[in-house]
C-alpha cells in the first residue's frame, strides 16, 4: 500500500464503508452487490489480455465470449433480477460495452413495456435464454433525434396479414444500433406504420434479421458493421437495410396501438406511450453519468494524492499535487457533482418505476413531466460528466493521456451519451416545451405540480426595484436549503424570460415554430437552469435522511460546494435576478475556497466510498493500493511493439535508408 494513500485514508473523519451503504441504499444491498461482483471477479473464465493491446476484431471476439460466458454463469448462479444482472456484468465490462447488452437494456424492456401478454409469452423466454439476441433499431443514417422524420416504412397487407418493411432511401438505412452489425438475430425496428392508405406514425416491430442456427441474414435484409468509431471498439454498431421484407402482423408490438386483421388501426391512449423505452433508457443514463464521473474522479484524486511535484515554498519537499489549491479547484467541484448525480440517478430510477406502475394502470398524469425530466437531466448530467471526465484526464498531466490511466477509455465510452438516445440540445428543447406549457398554465390561472411547482409563485416573484435590496438578505450561503431557494428563483426567472422572449418573437415572426427557433438559445438556458435547480434540490433534500453525523457533515460540505461553485460559474444569472449582490458573490467565491480546504482531508475516503474494484476501474493511476509507477512500467512492457528488441520495420525501411546515406 502506498504510504501517502494509507495516511490519507486514516485521516478521514468518517467511515467510507458506511457511506458506501448510503450510496447503495443499505448495507444489505452493498453485501449482495459485492457477493455478486466477486462471483465474476474471482472466475478464471473472465481473465483476458489488456484490451488496449488488441485489434478491434480481437476486442469484439473477447466481448462476445465474455457475454456468452456471463449468460451461462447467470443461469448457474440463478441471477435474474435486472439490478443484480447489472451488478454481475459491470466488474468485467470495463466502461460498460457489451455486444449483447441491448438485449437486456432495450429489447426486453421494450417488449415488457409495449408488448401484449401473448407477445411477452411468445418472445420473452427465448430472449431471456438468449436464443433471441436483440437490438433496438431506431436511428437512421439521415435522422436520429427527430423521430417523426424517420423514413423506414411498415405497410400492412391485409391479404396475407403481414407488414412489408422497406428502407425507401439511403438515408432511411438504420444506422448505429449496438449489436446489430454481427451479433443480433432480431431487432425491434421503429417504422412509419401505413395501413389502408394512411400513415399512423412510428410504431415498434419485432423483426427477425438473421436465421437461427446459421446466423445468416434473411433474404431482403442487408446488415453489417458501420466501421471504427471514436470508442466502443468492442461494440458492433450496425446498419440495416430492408427491401420488401415481410413479417407477420403479430410482430407489431400491440399493448397500446393495434392493427386488426382487416387493417383497421386502433390508436393508443397516448402517442407518447410509444416512447417508453427511450424514457427508461434516459432515466438509466443519469445513473451512468454518475458512475462514469465517479470513476474519473476516483482515478484523478488518487493519482493527485500519490503524485509529488514542484514546490510550494523553495527548498521544501515536493508536495502531493492535491495540496495545490488549483488542483483542488479542478477536482473537488467534480467530486461534489459526482455525489449530486448519484442521488439524482437514484431518484430517477425510483421515479421511473413509480410512474411506470401508474402508466400500466392507465394513469398518464405524470408522463409529460417524466418525459421532460428524463430528457433534460439526461442532457444536463451527460454534458457535465463529459467535460468533467476530460478535466480529470488533464488534471493527471501527461500520464492522463496514456491508456494506462483508464481515462481515455472512460471518455470515449461515455461521450456518445451526449448524442445517443436524443441529442442533448434537442433534449433540452423538449424540456423547454414542457416548461413553456407549464408557464402558460400558470399564466392562465392554473396551478402546476411536481418539479415545476415553483412557477406557481411567479406573479409574486417578478422582481421590482424595491425588492432587489430586500431579497438578498434571505440567502444564507452556508445553508443548502437557502441555496436551493436561490436556484429555484434563478430557474423561475430564466423560464419566465424565455417565455416572454418567445411571446415577443411570435408577434413579428411568420409562425410559432419560427419564433421558437429564434428563442431556442434562451429556451435551452431555461432548461439548464431548471435541471440545475432539480439537482441542487435533490442533493440538499437527501442530507436530512442521513443519520450518521460525520457523513452528513462531509456530504453537506460537498452539497454546499456543488451549489456555490454553480453560482460562481453562473454569477450573472444570480446578479441580474437580484438574487445575490456583488458582495455576496465575493463571499461565495471565498467560501468555495474554504470548502476546498475542508474537503481535502476527506478526499481519499470520499472516492473509496464509490467502491470501484481495480478491475472495473481499469486504471493504473487509480489503483486502490496506489502503487502506480511500478505497475505503469510493467504495463508499458506489455506493448506489442516490445515483443522484439528490433522491430521488423527497421530492417525493411530504416536500414536500407541508412545504407544509402
UniProtKB/Swiss-Prot annotation:
UniProt entry tagged with the keyword Repeat: no
Residue positions of motif Microbody targeting signal: 659-661
EC numbers, comma separated: 1.3.3.6
Enzyme type, top EC level: oxidoreductase
N6-acetyllysine sites (modified residues): 216, 255, 267, 272, 437, 446, 512, 637, 652
Cofactor: FAD
Sites of Phosphoserine modification: 649
A Pfam family matched in the record: ACOX
Cellular compartment(s): Peroxisome
Pathway assigned to this chain's UniProt record: Lipid metabolism; peroxisomal fatty acid beta-oxidation
Binding site for FAD: 139, 178
Key words of the record: Acetylation, FAD, Fatty acid metabolism, Flavoprotein, Lipid metabolism, Oxidoreductase, Peroxisome, Phosphoprotein
GO cellular component, one term: peroxisome
Major localization listed first in the record, in broad terms: other
Name the record gives this protein: Peroxisomal acyl-coenzyme A oxidase 1
Organism for this UniProt entry: Phascolarctos cinereus (Koala)
Gene: ACOX1
Amino acid at each position: 500500500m502506498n504510504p501517502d494513500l494509507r495516511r490519507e485514508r486514516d485521516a478521514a473523519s468518517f467511515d467510507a464503508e458506511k457511506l458506501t451503504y448510503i450510496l447503495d441504499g443499505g448495507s444489505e444491498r452493498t453485501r449482495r452487490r459485492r457477493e455478486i461482483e466477486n462471483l465474476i471477479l474471482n472466475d478464471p473464465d473472465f481473465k483476458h489480455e489488456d484490451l488496449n493491446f488488441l485489434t478491434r476484431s480481437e476486442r469484439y471476439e473477447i466481448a462476445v465470449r465474455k457475454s456468452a460466458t456471463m449468460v451461462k454463469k447467470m443461469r448457474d448462479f440463478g441471477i435474474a433480477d435486472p439490478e443484480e444482472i447489472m451488478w454481475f456484468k459491470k466488474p468485467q465490462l470495463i466502461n460498460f460495452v457489451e455486444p449483447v447488452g441491448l438485449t437486456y437494456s432495450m429489447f426486453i424492456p421494450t417488449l415488457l413495456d409495449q408488448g401484449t401478454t401473448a407477445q411477452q409469452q411468445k418472445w420473452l423466454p427465448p430472449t431471456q435464454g438468449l436464443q433471441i439476441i436483440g437490438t433496438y433499431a431506431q436511428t437512421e443514417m439521415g435522422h436520429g433525434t427527430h423521430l417523426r422524420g424517420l423514413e423506414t416504412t411498415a405497410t400492412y397487407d391485409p391479404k396475407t396479414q403481414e407488414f412489408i418493411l422497406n428502407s425507401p432511401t439511403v438515408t432511411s438505412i438504420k444506422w448505429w444500433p449496438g449489436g446489430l452489425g454481427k451479433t443480433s438475430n432480431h431487432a425491434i425496428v421503429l417504422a412509419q406504420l401505413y395501413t389502408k392508405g394512411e400513415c399512423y406514425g412510428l410504431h415498434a416491430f419485432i423483426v427477425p434479421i438473421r436465421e437461427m442456427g446459421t446466423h445468416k441474414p434473411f433474404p431482403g435484409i442487408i446488415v453489417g458493421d458501420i466501421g471504427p468509431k471514436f470508442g466502443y471498439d468492442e461494440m458492433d454498431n450496425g446498419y440495416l437495410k430492408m427491401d420488401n421484407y415481410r413479417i407477420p402482423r403479430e410482430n407489431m408490438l400491440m399493448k397500446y396501438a393495434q392493427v386488426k386483421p382487416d387493417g383497421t388501426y386502433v390508436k393508443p391512449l397516448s402517442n407518447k406511450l410509444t416512447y417508453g423505452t427511450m424514457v427508461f433508457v434516459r432515466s438509466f443514463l443519469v445513473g451512468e453519468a454518475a458512475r462514469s464521473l465517479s470513476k474519473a474522479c476516483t482515478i484523478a484524486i488518487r493519482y493527485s494524492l500519490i503524485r509529488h511535484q514542484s514546490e510550494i515554498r523553495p527548498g521544501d519537499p515536493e508536495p502531493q499535487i492535491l495540496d495545490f489549491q488549483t488542483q483542488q479547484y479542478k477536482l473537488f467541484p467534480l467530486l461534489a457533482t459526482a455525489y449530486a448525480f448519484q442521488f439524482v440517478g437514484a431518484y430517477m430510477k425510483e421515479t421511473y418505476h413509480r410512474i411506470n406502475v401508474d402508466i400500466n394502470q392507465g394513469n398518464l398524469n405524470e408522463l409529460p413531466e417524466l418525459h421532460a425530466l428524463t430528457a433534460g437531466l439526461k442532457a444536463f448530467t451527460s454534458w457535465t460528466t463529459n467535460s468533467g471526465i476530460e478535466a480529470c484526464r488533464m488534471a493527471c498531466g501527461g500520464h492522463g493521456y496514456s491508456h494506462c490511466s483508464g481515462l481515455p477509455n472512460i471518455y470515449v465510452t461515455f461521450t456518445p451519451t451526449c448524442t445517443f438516445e436524443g441529442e442533448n440540445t434537442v433534449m433540452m428543447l423538449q424540456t423547454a416545451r414542457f416548461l413553456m406549457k407549464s408557464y402558460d398554465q400558470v399564466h392562465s390561472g392554473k396551478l402546476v405540480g411536481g418539479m415545476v411547482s415553483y412557477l406557481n409563485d411567479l406573479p409574486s416573484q417578478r422582481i421590482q426595484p424595491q425588492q432587489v435590496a430586500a431579497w438578498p438578505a434571505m440567502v444564507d450561503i452556508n445553508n443548502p436549503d437557502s441555496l436551493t431557494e436561490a436556484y429555484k428563483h434563478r430557474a423561475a426567472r430564466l423560464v419566465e424570460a424565455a417565455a416572454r422572449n418567445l411571446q415577443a418573437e411570435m408577434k413579428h415572426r411568420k409562425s410559432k415554430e419560427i419564433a421558437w427557433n429564434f428563442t431556442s438559445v434562451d429556451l435551452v438556458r431555461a432548461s439548464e437552469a431548471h435541471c440545475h435547480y432539480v439537482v441542487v434540490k435533490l442533493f440538499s433534500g437527501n442530507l436530512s435522511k442521513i443519520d450518521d453525523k460525520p457523513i452528513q457533515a462531509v456530504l453537506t460540505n460537498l452539497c454546499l460546494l456543488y451549489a456555490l461553485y454553480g453560482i460562481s460559474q453562473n454569477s450573472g444569472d444570480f446578479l441580474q435576478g437580484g438574487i445575490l449582490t456583488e458582495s455576496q458573490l465575493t463571499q461565495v467565491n471565498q467560501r468555495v475556497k474554504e470548502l476546498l480546504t475542508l474537503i481535502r482531508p476527506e478526499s481519499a475516503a470520499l472516492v473509496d466510498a464509490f467502491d470501484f474494484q481495480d478491475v472495473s476501474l481499469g486504471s493504473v493511476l487509480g489503483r486502490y493500493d496506489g502503487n502506480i509507477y511500478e505497475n505503469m512500467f510493467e504495463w508499458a512492457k506489455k506493448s506489442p511493439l516490445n515483443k522484439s528488441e528490433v522491430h521488423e520495420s527497421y530492417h525493411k525501411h530504416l536500414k536500407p535508408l541508412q545504407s544509402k546515406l
